Amino acid sequence: MADLLSLDAQMPLIANIDTGPLWGASADRGQVQRHLDTGADDGPAADWSVGHFTNPVDVQRGTGGAIVTVRDTYPALGGGIHLQPASRFAAALRRDDGREGGVLCVCDAGRAAGLERDLAARGLQVRHWDNGTPEPSSG
């Protein structure tokens, strides 16, 4: 995620995640700081486990862990912004719930080919996302 965020601050990222692995909205600043300092993973359990689109905007690194700042469309959970351990956000992105996850990188059309090369060079898979919707028949 940090690699994607470092590519271009003007390129919004939209992540398709499973919320189950995330910390719950009641995580406090002390838990966040402990994670940054020691890697402790003592945050609250997730509030729910559903497929959800979010906007990761920053990664803060500490001596023991990293925290992803995630914008969200549900202001009731974290006021529209959550602070999540990077390892939990990665698990949410993997979507171990049997569904597809991933990150949509939004850029100007003229930059798409270069972005695709940059992402592939970082070892990321670049492809169309299949949400399971059947393709329309051609006849």
Residue ranges and their predicted role:
Residues 37-51, 58-139:
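Noncatalytic regulatory segments and standalone regulatory/sensor domains
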